[in-house]
Amino acid sequence: MTEAQTACATTETPVAAPAAPRWRVADVIALYELPFNDLLFRAQQTHREHFDANAIQLSTLLSIKTGGCEEDCGYCSQSAHHDTGLKAEKLMEVDAVLAAARTAKENGATRFCMGAAWRNPKDRHIEPIKEMIRGVKDMGLETCVTLGMLEEHQAKALAEAGLDYYNHNLDTSPEFYGQIISTRTYQDRLDTLERVRDAGINVCCGGIIGMGESRRERAGLIAQLANMNPYPESVPINNLVAIEGTPLENAQALDPFEFVRTIAVARITMPKAMVRLSAGREQLDDAMQALCFLAGANSMFYGDVLLTTGNPRAEADRKLLARLGMSASEASQLSA
């Protein structure tokens, strides 16, 4: 080797080793296994470092295109693969969506989410959805949409319309995923999330628990979310609603304390995220919902229906927050 070659060899930049995950599944399991009081104490401490512990964001979710979805998600009433009696409907008109958003704002919501039951939107769908986004934002509401998988140009178009958040859940851990859905891969979901992030839209990504997964698999979902770089700004945690006609209609109900533990673990591992109580709140009594707030949930979906499943009535939610001395926050950007 010549002197020049030797010099080149010795100054060559070494290849960096892959970054270690911030949270190993074993670490997340260890959080789950803490005594309940210790877990909630730690979660509440973490929560108070970044948020007003007595403020809850109220979100409303509207199904802007219902039923007839090509995917075979085992939990979903909107899948064309399942006989749930749900009638497929076309995309709602822009004016009807904006009217629903006005009602949501009048009822106290500060965030308006629009969901469409598609595998992926067609390009012809993007323009009316951009109109919906702009109209909702003009009302001073935060916007979120969930439309299925996105192409890069579609994500950019939504960003240009001013979309605040795009929701695309992982649903469960990579290991359990194949037992829930076969028509879309885990990597498909991660690819869409990357396109959303690259377009400059905040990521809303969480999952569903109570689908028959083990605690290890719940921990696997949380680890997957927490190890995203960065982790999602918004993390909805859904409690399975077992719907007649779906493959999971006979799923055993989850212990509500396990749901609260999941909220706490999400808060500890993703300290600055909005952790959102989503579907399945009807299965939690007021005391359990209060424990979820103590565990670090700082948003809840508000209104009588979430897409196609029931939800506690808005008046009951207002009364619960008043009993707890909590108030509705103006927006989700509460983190210090």
From Swiss-Prot:
InterPro entries given for it? Aldolase_TIM, BATS_dom, Biotin_synth/BioAB, Biotin_synthase, Elp3/MiaA/NifB-like_rSAM, rSAM
Give the residues the record marks as binding [2Fe-2S] cluster. C113, C144, C204, R276
Reaction(s) catalyzed by this protein? (4R,5S)-dethiobiotin + (sulfur carrier)-SH + 2 reduced [2Fe-2S]-[ferredoxin] + 2 S-adenosyl-L-methionine = (sulfur carrier)-H + biotin + 2 5'-deoxyadenosine + 2 L-methionine + 2 oxidized [2Fe-2S]-[ferredoxin]
Entries under Gene3D superfamilies matching the protein:
Aldolase class I
Report the sequence similarity comment from the record: Belongs to the radical SAM superfamily. Biotin synthase family.
Taxonomic source organism: Burkholderia mallei (strain ATCC 23344)
Q: Provide the residue positions that the database annotates as binding [4Fe-4S] cluster.
A: C69, C73, C76
| Cofactor binding notes | Binds 1 [4Fe-4S] cluster. The cluster is coordinated with 3 cysteines and an exchangeable S-adenosyl-L-methionine. Binds 1 [2Fe-2S] cluster. The cluster is coordinated with 3 cysteines and 1 arginine.
Sorted alphabetically, the keyword list is: 2Fe-2S, 4Fe-4S, Biotin biosynthesis, Iron, Iron-sulfur, Metal-binding, S-adenosyl-L-methionine, Transferase
Q: What does this protein do?
A: Catalyzes the conversion of dethiobiotin (DTB) to biotin by the insertion of a sulfur atom into dethiobiotin via a radical-based mechanism.
- Which metal ions or organic cofactors does this protein require, according to UniProt? [4Fe-4S] cluster; [2Fe-2S] cluster
Identify the taxonomic lineage of the organism of origin. Answer: Bacteria, Pseudomonadati, Pseudomonadota, Betaproteobacteria, Burkholderiales
Gene Ontology biological process: biotin biosynthetic process
Protein name per Swiss-Prot or TrEMBL: Biotin synthase
> What pathway, per the record?
Cofactor biosynthesis; biotin biosynthesis; biotin from 7,8-diaminononanoate: step 2/2
Q: What SMART domains does this protein map onto?
A: BATS, Elp3
Assembly and interaction partners: Homodimer.
Q: What is its EC number?
A: 2.8.1.6
Q: Where is the Radical SAM core domain?
A: 54-281
GO MF terms held by the record: 2 iron, 2 sulfur cluster binding; 4 iron, 4 sulfur cluster binding; biotin synthase activity; iron ion binding
